[in-house]
From Swiss-Prot:
Catalyzes the removal of terminal sialic acid residues from viral and cellular glycoconjugates. Cleaves off the terminal sialic acids on the glycosylated HA during virus budding to facilitate virus release. Additionally helps virus spread through the circulation by further removing sialic acids from the cell surface. These cleavages prevent self-aggregation and ensure the efficient spread of the progeny virus from cell to cell. Otherwise, infection would be limited to one round of replication. This is Neuraminidase. GO terms for biological process: carbohydrate metabolic process; viral budding from plasma membrane. Its EC number is 3.2.1.18. GO terms for cellular component: host cell plasma membrane; membrane; virion membrane. The keyword Metal-binding applies. It comes from the Viruses. Inhibited by the neuraminidase inhibitors zanamivir (Relenza) and oseltamivir (Tamiflu). These drugs interfere with the release of progeny virus from infected cells and are effective against all influenza strains. Resistance to neuraminidase inhibitors is quite rare. The gene is NA. The influenza A genome consist of 8 RNA segments. Genetic variation of hemagglutinin and/or neuraminidase genes results in the emergence of new influenza strains. The mechanism of variation can be the result of point mutations or the result of genetic reassortment between segments of two different strains. Residues 91-469 are annotated as: Head of neuraminidase. Pfam families: Neur.
Length: 469
């Protein structure tokens, strides 16, 4: 074979090998395309599984969570039945108070991402209890915590988290922009009330299930403010009290009735020489009872009770066991304001039982420190200072602060009565301690008709923090 023949032979072999390789590549592409088409058709026609479809009526929501596990769509259905919280039951008979929650937020905040906050309160639906609180738009041990002793700023927001958990950006839910607030559940949805804006023109924004439903404009242009604790819902209607006017003189007080977040009725109290601020309200046998703060001139606490048509009665707790702070030493009470050492005050609460009353108060008569519960069997109507029981909550050497009431409805507890509960704010930082910030943690207790403990459950944080040094 000569040279030209060898060249032609080699070229022919290379051409044949190239053609075979090209055909193999084309076949590989066709195979991949067919395989992809088969997979696509399988995804577009998933295997049908046996599913039960349950239809709920009467204002019921069904929450469905889709969880992707190994490319399999699994539907986890959770039915949540809504009801109307009746609020028609009486308060449960109790003999003392059992510790219910403690969030330790200041202790945890020395190292964790915890909100700077104050004015915490608790409210329960028929399914859960949540802690609500007013943040300062800052975290503990961070530079933005500086100057958070200020009550009203555009950075304050109402948020909530599960009860007993330290409030952080990771477990908290935004509710409203607010420096004064209230919230409650009617069995069908959460109502939140958040007040924000300038002192001479603040506005309360009402939300129902997170949607704005109504607003209330300041009517006296002197720091519109509300409860800093839960509102009250009875038979689908919810009730709150707001104050507008001086903190050290006669102001204006209004009761609002709301349904699904919309105001349907309001009245202004005819209450000369009374001062109502930061009311702690609860339902009792279809009516609302509120025990409030007199920041003007009383050592004892004013109250207002009203029915669902807003027919109301007013008074002061008569007992000589005084509940405000600062206050006079216990002595002769009055069913009107006890004027001795009555200027200024602190948010607080009491529970009425017929002629008797459970009074929650600081142990100190001059500073927000210590806390105790006192049972005065005739203190709602009589003026003596005798009482039959005292339960220690916070030692007099530890800081306390605001306190307020909340309840657990029979729809939550399964009991045939409304369980009374209360929370105590444990304020730390400015103005009493050497920090750049002011914040608080909280504890809560619920009434029981069984054994309880006398002890102290303080905040317990070791101050100052790194940011303060």
């Amino acid at each position: 074979m000569n040279t030209n023949q060898r060249i032609i032979t080699i070229g022919t072999i290379c051409l044949i090998v190239g053609i075979i390789s090209l055909l193999l590549q084309i076949g590989n592409i066709i195979s991949l395309w067919i395989s992809h088409s088969i997979q696509t058709r399988e995804k577009n026609h998933p295997e049908v599984c046996n599913q039960s479809v349950i239809t709920y009526e009467n204002n019921t929501w069904v929450n469905q969570t889709y969880v992707n596990i190994s490319n399999a769509n699994i539907v986890a259905g959770q039915g949540v039945t809504s009801i109307i919280l009746a609020g028609n039951s009486p308060l449960c008979p109790i003999s003392g108070w059992a510790i219910y929650s403690k969030d330790n937020s200041i202790r945890i905040g020395s190292k964790g991402d915890i909100f700077v906050m104050r004015e915490p309160f608790i409210s329960c639906s028929h399914l859960e209890c949540r802690t609500f609180f007013l943040t300062q738009g800052a975290l503990l041990n961070d530079k933005h915590s500086n100057g958070t002793v200020k009550d009203r700023s555009p950075y304050r927001t109402l948020m909530s988290c599960p009860i007993g958990e330290a409030p952080s950006p990771y477990n908290s839910r935004f509710e409203s922009v607010a420096w004064s607030a209230s919230a409650c559940h009617d069995g069908m949805g959460w109502l939140t009330i958040g007040i924000s804006g300038p002192d001479n023109g603040a506005v309360a924004v009402l939300k129902y299930n997170g949607i704005i439903t109504d607003t209330i404009k300041s009517w006296r242009n002197k720091i519109l403010r509300t409860q800093e604790s839960e509102c009250v819902c009875i038979n689908g209607s919810c009730f709150t009290i707001m104050t507008d006017g001086p903190s050290n003189g006669q102001a204006s007080y209004k009761i609002f009735k709301m349904e699904k977040g919309r105001i349907i009725k309001s009245i202004e109290l005819d209450a000369p020489n009374y001062h109502y601020e930061e009311c702690s309200c609860y339902p009792d046998t279809g009516k609302v009872v509120c025990v409030c703060r007199d920041n003007w001139h009383a050592s004892n606490r004013p109250w207002v009770s009203f029915d669902q048509n807003l027919n109301y009665q007013i008074g002061y707790i008569c007992s000589g066991v005084f509940g405000d702070n600062p206050r006079s030493n216990d002595g002769k009470g009055n069913c009107g304001p006890v004027l001795s050492n009555g200027a200024n005050g602190v948010k607080g609460f009491s529970f009425r039982y017929g002629n008797g009353v459970w009074i929650g108060r600081t142990k100190s008569i001059s500073s927000r420190s210590g806390f105790e519960m006192i049972w005065d069997p005739n203190g709602w109507t009589e003026t003596d200072s005798s009482f039959s029981m005292k339960q220690d909550i916070i030692a007099s050497t530890d800081w306390s602060g605001y306190s307020g009431s909340f309840v657990q409805h029979p729809e939550l507890t399964g009991m045939d009565c409304i369980r009374p509960c209360f929370w105590v704010e444990l304020i730390r930082g400015q103005p009493k301690e050497s920090t750049i910030w002011t914040s608080g943690s909280s504890i809560s207790f619920c009434g029981v008709n069984s054994g309880t403990a006398n002890w102290s459950w303080p905040d317990g944080a070791d101050l100052p923090f790194t940011i303060d040094k």
